[in-house]
Amino acid sequence: MIIRSPEPEVKILVDRDPIKTSFEEWAKPGHFSRTIAKGPDTTTWIWNLHADAHDFDSHTNDLEEISRKVFSAHFGQLSIIFLWLSGMYFHGARFSNYEAWLSDPTHIRPSAQVVWPIVGQEILNGDVGGGFRGIQITSGFFQIWRASGITSELQLYCTAIGALVFAALMLFAGWFHYHKAAPKLAWFQDVESMLNHHLTGLLGLGSLSWAGHQIHVSLPINQFLNAAVDPKEIPLPHEFILNRDLLAQLYPSFAEGATPFFTLNWSKYAEFLTFRGGLDPVTGGLWLTDIIHHHLAIAILFLIAGHMYRTNWGIGHSIKDILEAHKGPFTGQGHKGLYEILTTSWHAQLSINLAMLGSLTIVVAHHMYSMPPYPYLATDYGTQLSLFTHHMWIGGFLIVGAAAHAAIFMVRDYDPTIRYNDLLDRVLRHRDAIISHLNWVCIFLGFHSFGLYIHNDTMSALGRPQDMFSDTAIQLQPVFAQWIQNTHALAPGTTAPGATTSTSLTWGGDNLVAVGGKVALLPIPLGTADFLVHHIHAFTIHVTVLILLKGVLFARSSRLIPDKANLGFRFPCDGPGRGGTCQVSAWDHVFLGLFWMYNSISVVIFHFSWKMQSDVWGSISDQGIVNHITGGNFAQSSITINGWLRDFLWAQASQVIQSYGSSLSAYGLFFLGAHFVWAFSLMFLFSGRGYWQELIESIVWAHNKLKVAPATQPRALSIVQGRAVGVTHYLLGGIATTWAFFLARIIAVG
């Protein structure tokens, strides 16, 4: 007789038809809230409608219902992303010079937009080479398309249509998984299964299939393109996939198929799985064979990782066990209870994910120029500058978002009665020590970093260059950074014996890669100027962290307002009759943190823009002499505040200021308009609610006099609304100004 263990019951993890599809309900503004659904009495109604439409916590207390709404909304988000991608590919197919660029990427610049000749706007269509007139784009799409093996505009059309189909599919999925088959709460909380599927499916199989595409499609097509074969002569992607002999002509080991893999004779594959380091001298991008090797390795890593967590089979890790075992000598209960927090508070979960994704986005920004992954990306200076700037801004916003949702978690989801002596509780109990020390660090960094600049400005003004902090007088060399650079430059042959070149040319050595007479990358020297500005980076980042962390740690209570948790996430002040309690809500800390995030990122992208123009980007003569765009002036000019104002902001703004009448004139108009949007924000930030209410009353009086008064009573923005409108215009105005300044400059000189 065979004794079997009882089969685990199959759990039903969805509810069928939980909520009926009702267009009547959707057509009613504010249907999710009893108050808002009544319709407007005052103009505040429209603001509340927008503020609460996606605040699912305010619609219901049922965690399952909230989870379903979030899940469904994610499909909507994916649909929008597919729609956007489809638009990008369609522009590439319909309005671009992609095929011309592909045939001569060093002389022809990418363009995927042609302006219609309405009221003289055709001036914006600049000559991008090859007889094509259009707007130069700096998104990097052309470079990605070439790297992935797209050789014709027809292929772009097909991809665009495919993305539209996926967009429709995602919209359907969002409706289906809310109205037809909605997952139960247990499904959202099954973290081990989720980890296994996401790690194996998204990251493991995703990387494996990408590596497969790169080997079978991208690699042969890029080989032909690098050898200057006409794109129309190159076999189509499916021919490489279906006909192994085609690949074997380029890479003989292909003839052996999978035999070397199963006989462990893996070195046979070294033709297309390499570990070279450095850049391909033809394209100025990473070696495609290195990239393939990377994706294959990542795939194997995540396929293993995706089998590590305990589900129905009773083997593997349990996240709860791991967290509860995580105790140290000074950490009390450690992570006990964290599992319950992360499976019942999506704000806590989102906060951690935003912090990690934001940091990762900033890491991406730094790798895009130091290890440019796509062909002809490194010599497209406009795209390099745009990608760095874009990823820095996105990373900054995501990190502020992490603090915002951490604070919302503290206010709405944290239960202090059941949390005792775990890590979070211990951090909260010594929050005064944390914040006061962090405050001291900010003061120290601020005075010292700024003080070094002020010293230099003073000495410069007094005509005493020998007393300045500079590479030629009193040196403050970034010795630790230089040591790290040197270690990496020496790594090939020592710590990485298989590699021929270091991971990035920026580390040092004497390697320089130039493509078509333009510098792709070279070793980046660091000196006193970098030491100074890096301490400004440290200062601005620490102040941002101080504001955001104070908002999180004091979200529920403080000495000033012990019952802050009862007032909610956002409130203007602690009620009438208690002065000095405004701007203390967790929301206000996010509001203030956004300004410092803006400061931080601005200094970073200014540093990057000037440093690259001064020390990296430029042309190279036949004799091998490099002529940089700003002639290496960063080291001597950026060591004073005056230098930053005169030789960076003012000198490099000449292109955007003088752009009128040229194809760059749109940037001049944006520069002007975005300054205006930025200035408009100050109206909301510097004036109070009462001022506007008084003005409104008088305007309403005039309307009554003429018998044209509206039924909905006009109201001034609330304090929080005014601040929200203010910070939005401040950031968008500032970012758009910087964008216009950067692009007009780099397109003109790059």
Curated annotation (Swiss-Prot):
Membrane topology is: Multi-pass membrane protein
What's the Enzyme Commission number for this chain? 1.97.1.12
- Give the family per the record: Belongs to the PsaA/PsaB family.
Where it mainly occurs, coarsely classed, is: plastid
Write out the coiled-coil annotation as residue ranges: none
A Gene Ontology molecular function term of the record: magnesium ion binding
Q: Which Pfam families match?
A: PsaA_PsaB
**InterPro entries for this protein:** PSI_PsaA, PSI_PsaA/B, PSI_PsaA/B_CS, PSI_PsaA/B_sf
The lineage is: Eukaryota, Viridiplantae, Streptophyta, Embryophyta, Tracheophyta
- Cystine crosslinks: none
Natural source organism: Glycine max (Soybean)
Q: Does the keyword Transport apply?
A: yes
UniProt function note: PsaA and PsaB bind P700, the primary electron donor of photosystem I (PSI), as well as the electron acceptors A0, A1 and FX. PSI is a plastocyanin-ferredoxin oxidoreductase, converting photonic excitation into a charge separation, which transfers an electron from the donor P700 chlorophyll pair to the spectroscopically characterized acceptors A0, A1, FX, FA and FB in turn. Oxidized P700 is reduced on the lumenal side of the thylakoid membrane by plastocyanin.
Cofactor descriptive note: P700 is a chlorophyll a/chlorophyll a' dimer, A0 is one or more chlorophyll a, A1 is one or both phylloquinones and FX is a shared 4Fe-4S iron-sulfur center.
Binding annotation for chlorophyll a': 675
Locate the residues binding phylloquinone.
692
User: Which parts of the sequence bind chlorophyll a?
Assistant: 683, 691
Q: Which reaction does it catalyse?
A: reduced [plastocyanin] + hnu + oxidized [2Fe-2S]-[ferredoxin] = oxidized [plastocyanin] + reduced [2Fe-2S]-[ferredoxin]
Subunit structure, interactors included: The PsaA/B heterodimer binds the P700 chlorophyll special pair and subsequent electron acceptors. PSI consists of a core antenna complex that captures photons, and an electron transfer chain that converts photonic excitation into a charge separation. The eukaryotic PSI reaction center is composed of at least 11 subunits.
**GO BP of this protein:** photosynthesis
Residues binding [4Fe-4S] cluster are: 573, 582
The name under which this protein is listed is Photosystem I P700 chlorophyll a apoprotein A1
> What keywords sit in the KW lines?
4Fe-4S, Chlorophyll, Chloroplast, Chromophore, Electron transport, Iron, Iron-sulfur, Magnesium, Membrane, Metal-binding, Oxidoreductase, Photosynthesis, Photosystem I, Plastid, Thylakoid, Transmembrane, Transmembrane helix, Transport
State any GO CC term.
Answer: chloroplast thylakoid membrane
Q: Which PANTHER family match?
A: OUTER MEMBRANE PROTEIN, OMPA-RELATED, PHOTOSYSTEM I P700 CHLOROPHYLL A APOPROTEIN A1-RELATED
Q: Where in the cell is it found?
A: Plastid, Chloroplast thylakoid membrane
